[in-house]
């Protein structure tokens, strides 16, 4: 191994000089820092600052020395294989890339908006329907019942209450065959039947409410203390 003389006049190895920058001269420190492109404008004449910069940026990191036995040789071979594998892998990934990497440079930020078509038609047709479709939709949403003009060849049974609460059915035929007086009578009968049907549950509910308190009173047992 080659040996060199430091600033203190001590014979040391070249590798040890890098680990002990205080033994190096100012010119050597400046040269080594300039080769590593480290700016040293503020510490040109100050060796202490140069040594601090060298320790911070240029001093090699400590590495473990493997023993000279079978295990050490095996680990050295593994380290070499790992380094070769990483180099080959990086070269293969760069060469086998299907497409170049995407770089966002600010110029490719303009995008266009695409409207997806539906099965029934374009989105514009769905947003702006034709007048026929709009009229059909309004008719379907707001159907107007017509009492005076029922459909022909169809009979509707009208419920009427009797003495025992039984319902009789009366057929209602076309409006052309029915006189206006009979039509008014039928309408009044329909209204009365609807009122009776609506009032019946209320009466039953009142009867049920009248029976419930008596049953609750019967269940209450008064406790007497001795």
UniProtKB/Swiss-Prot annotation:
**What GO biological process terms does the UniProt entry carry, in alphabetical order?**
anterior/posterior pattern specification; convergent extension involved in gastrulation; embryonic morphogenesis; regulation of apoptotic process; Spemann organizer formation at the dorsal lip of the blastopore
Q: Which domain of life does the protein's organism represent?
A: Eukaryota
Keyword Nucleus recorded: yes
A UniProt-annotated Pfam family: Ashwin
Where, per UniProt, does this protein localize?
Answer: Nucleus
Signal sequence annotation: none
Predominant localisation class: nucleus
Q: Where are the transmembrane segments?
A: none
- What are the UniProt keywords, alphabetically? Developmental protein, Nucleus
Q: Where is the composition biased (Polar residues)?
A: 121-143
Looking at the record, which segments are called Disordered? 89-171, 205-226
User: Which cysteines are cross-linked by disulfides?
Assistant: none
Tissue-wise expression: Expressed in the neural plate and later in the embryonic brain, eyes, and spinal cord.
Family from the record: Belongs to the ashwin family.
This chain's function reads: May regulate cell survival and anterior-posterior patterning.
Which protein, by its recorded name, is this?
Ashwin
- Encoding gene (name): c2orf49
């Amino acid at each position: 191994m080659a040996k060199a003389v430091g600033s203190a006049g001590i014979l040391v190895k070249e590798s040890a000089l890098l680990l002990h920058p205080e033994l190096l001269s100012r010119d050597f420190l400046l040269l080594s820092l300039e080769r590593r492109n480290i700016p040293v404008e503020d510490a040109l004449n100050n060796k202490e600052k140069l040594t601090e910069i060298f320790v911070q940026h240029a001093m090699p990191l400590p590495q473990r020395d493997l023993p000279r036995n079978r295990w050490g040789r095996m680990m050295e071979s593994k380290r070499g294989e790992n380094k070769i594998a990483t180099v080959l892998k990086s070269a293969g990934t760069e060469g086998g890339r299907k497409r170049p990497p995407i770089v966002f440079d600010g110029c490719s930020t303009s995008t266009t908006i695409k409207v997806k078509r539906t099965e029934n038609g374009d989105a514009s047709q769905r947003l702006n329907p034709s007048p026929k479709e709009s009229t059909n939709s309004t008719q379907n949403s707001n159907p107007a019942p017509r009492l005076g003009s029922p459909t022909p060849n169809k009979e509707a049974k009208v419920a009427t209450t009797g003495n025992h609460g039984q319902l009789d059915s009366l057929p209602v035929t076309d409006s052309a065959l029915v006189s206006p007086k009979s039509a008014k009578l039928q309408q009044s009968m329909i209204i009365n039947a609807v009122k009776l049907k609506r009032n019946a549950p209320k009466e039953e509910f009142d009867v049920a409410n009248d029976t419930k308190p008596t049953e609750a009173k019967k269940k209450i047992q008064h406790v007497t203390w001795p």
